Amino acid sequence: MNKIEILTCHCKKVEIELNLENGVEELVRCNCSLCKRRGYVMAKIKLENLKVKRGQDQLSVYKFGKKQLAEHFFCKNCGIYTHHRSYTNPKNYEYNVACIDNINSFEYKNIPVFDGEKL
């Protein structure tokens, strides 16, 4: 059974539909130079299970590093990071768990840290 969740930025100009086939999966934090500054809890999702429903024109993309492979999306208006295309697996996105209203990201404990510092 598919479970649909809606992810929004703070100002609600960006709305993203997540098809969470098995709920929130593969929680992770990252210690790369960008992620350690923003401190978010992220979860993985297949590309086809994330759809921008509203506000595509409100999303900005930020890339960094030598290869600039990961695309980090954030709202132009409120600045909230919503999701990014995975650097290590381009068939996945990782999304900001805290952007789902009915999920409290502070309840998740012992979240593994991806060693993005090496990238």
What does each of the following model-derived ranges do?
Residues 1-8, 13-119:
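A short Gly-Trp-Pro
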